[in-house]
Amino acid sequence: MKTVIRPDIRRKHIYLHQGIVYDRQPLLNGEMRDLHVSLLSPVGHRTKDTNRYPCMVWVCGGAWRGGRERAAEMLPELMFLAEEGVIIAAAEYRIIGEAVFPAQINDVLTAVRFLRTNAEKYHIDPERIGIIGSSAGGHLTLLAANNDGQFDTQAYSNVSSHVKCAVDLYGIADIEAVYQFNLNAIKQGKRPGRSNIPEEFPECMLLGGLPSDDPVRAKQAGGINGICEHTCPVLVMHGSDDHVVSIEQSEMYYHAMTAAGKDVRYYIVDGADHGSDEFFQEETRAVIRDFLNEKL
């Protein structure tokens, strides 16, 4: 059988660019680590394209343990944005055990400045960079959304780490509240399969100790505590049945943003657990897509 077809062009070819080193940082064991960013882009190495595209920096979750091998794991689920002409940049960051807070948000903001510095090379519109993250990545996303400069480093310091908008998927807004939640869960026998030793809670490993050991660091680690005049518009989505990060985190953040007069959209995903399939359906994608069409 021989057939001629003429497809309508409804989407661009999407390219994956990997192994891009954006920084090199020391670890607690004295070694150095290259930090990479992977891109989903409508522009390939041989593509003749002079356009600039908006960019969303993806920050992965995994209890602050996913910023290494798993940094680009969710890129397939973000193809729906790439097909809309949004460059997706999955940024690695130093994980717990490699560095303590604020190294993780330092790295994420360095990645933003790297992309802005190299905007022409990667066909990025430097005025249209946003951030999206889930779980622990949502925590870092909310910190980045404040645009307050307190976590900037000297790398690529000639440009801003400002993000235009942020999408937080079932993330953590208040580290101290998470710690108290987990302590209460121990008393109620609701932490099966997870450590009951406070020093081994992920949030304590992130801080390098209990929140009470360094209250200032613990407070700084909560995006809810840094809401200010520079905080960008934020979309929050959280599952009603989340058993890992309590929906109270997003409730508190929503009320704090509202009280501060900031632009916040809060969607409760009915019946959804932590990172469950409900977050990757067309209905939830449409919410994210519409928000970015308006704010990015």
PLM features: residue spans?
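Alpha/beta-hydrolase superfamily serine-hydrolase fold, recognizing
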Residues: 1-296
